[in-house]
């Protein structure tokens, strides 16, 4: 390596090192200033203004189910409680949950339909779309067990996604927007400081 090449390589190394220092400092400075708390109002506003961008590419639903022995002495009460599902019913179902083979009572959470029906082996992937209806109760039975299922609400593919379902995405978008604005602000301050010190180099 001749002297010219060595000089050029040294300059590249210095530039790379300086860029790395600047990037590390920049990342640390931005992270220290970044507010990652996003309130519900901000999420709601962004969602309302950008609804067209949040259409689901999967069928979604909110629902609950119980899988229980068809010889269970409480079967009639379980059926009634699962359908009605008031506070008393919830307490009752929770108190006998050990009698269930499997169950899910968290019907406030939106899930992809195929994930929900995968827990119900009596319903094939081809058949489950027949059950995608709002406020639906149905019952399936094999030789040993009964499947009691309530579908509260359905959102079909290409329809507007529920805000709660896309809430984590909305929150991350808003945090990224804040981060981008901090990066732009940081770059502006670096440029202004460079001009003030007459040490800014244009490439």
Where in this protein do the model-derived segments appear?
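Peptidyl-prolyl cis-trans isomerase
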Residues: 1-203
């Amino acid at each position: 390596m001749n002297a010219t090449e060595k000089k050029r390589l040294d300059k590249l190394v210095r530039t790379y090192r300086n860029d790395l220092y600047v990037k590390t400092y920049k990342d640390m400075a931005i992270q220290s200033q970044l507010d990652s708390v996003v309130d519900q109002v901000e999420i709601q506003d962004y969602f309302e203004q950008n609804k067209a961008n949040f259409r689901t590419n999967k069928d979604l639903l909110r629902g609950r189910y119980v899988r229980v022995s068809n010889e269970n002495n409480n079967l009639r009460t379980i059926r009634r409680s699962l359908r009605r599902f008031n506070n008393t019913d919830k307490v009752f179902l929770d108190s006998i949950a050990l009698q269930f083979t499997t169950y899910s009572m968290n019907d406030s959470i939106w899930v992809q339909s195929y994930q929900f029906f995968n827990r119900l082996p009596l319903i094939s992937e081809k058949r489950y779309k027949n059950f995608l209806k709002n406020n639906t109760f149905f019952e399936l039975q094999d030789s040993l067990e009964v499947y009691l299922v309530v579908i509260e609400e359905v959102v079909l593919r290409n329809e507007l996604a529920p805000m709660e379902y896309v809430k984590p995405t909305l929150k991350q978008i808003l945090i990224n927007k804040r981060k981008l604005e901090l990066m732009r602000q940081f770059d502006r301050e670096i440029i202004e400081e460079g001009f003030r010190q007459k040490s800014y180099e244009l490439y």
